Amino acid sequence: MTDNVTFTLRPLPKAAFVAGYAGLLPQVIAAAMVLSGMEYRWTGLAAAYGYAAFIFSFLGGMWWGLAVTTRNNDTAANGIFALAVAPSLLSLVTYLPWIWGWEWPGPSLAWLGIFLMLSPLGDRWLSSRCALPLGWMKLRWRLSIGLGGTTLFLAAFA
């Protein structure tokens, strides 16, 4: 049995924008800790790394959810599922230098910042394979540039 589900594209609610922008605050607080020059510098860098990695992984979870609920067809979903696990795997790869005692967190922050800033390209690709809410790309670009840019900025201070 096949269920034919039709999705009506509705604009994102204002709450999505408010919550999204509020989601930038932890990275801004981490930046303030790093730039304060106080003993919280290392804590700020580690928190900035962790938050960027969590959010990047969360993005993959959103992509997974979109693939499950709004895909155009099962064939289109295969690539979406592969895309959806990439953020978690890339976040893990950026964590490995710390485990192995290599230089960290500067390069890891830089890579995460770049990945975050480029992540809306995945959403663009996704938009041809599943339904995205109206305003999605606008919000995604703004949040990705905001979080990715702040993360990349902090990499310079690591």
Locate predicted features.
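Loop-to-helix transition at the N-terminal end of transmembrane alpha-helices
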Residues: 42-58
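Transmembrane helix-loop-helix
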Residues: 95-118
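Helix-adjacent hinge/juxtasegments
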Residues: 65-97
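Short, Lys/Arg-rich, polar N-terminal cytosolic tail immediately upstream
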Residues: 1-12
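Alpha-helical transmembrane segments and their membrane-interface exit regions
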Residues: 54-55, 59, 114-125
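Interfacial loop-to-transmembrane junctions
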Residues: 122, 126-148
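Small-residue-rich segments of transmembrane alpha-helices in multi-pass membrane proteins
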Residues: 23-30, 81-92, 139-154
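Short, hydrophobic transmembrane alpha-helix segments
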Residues: 33-45
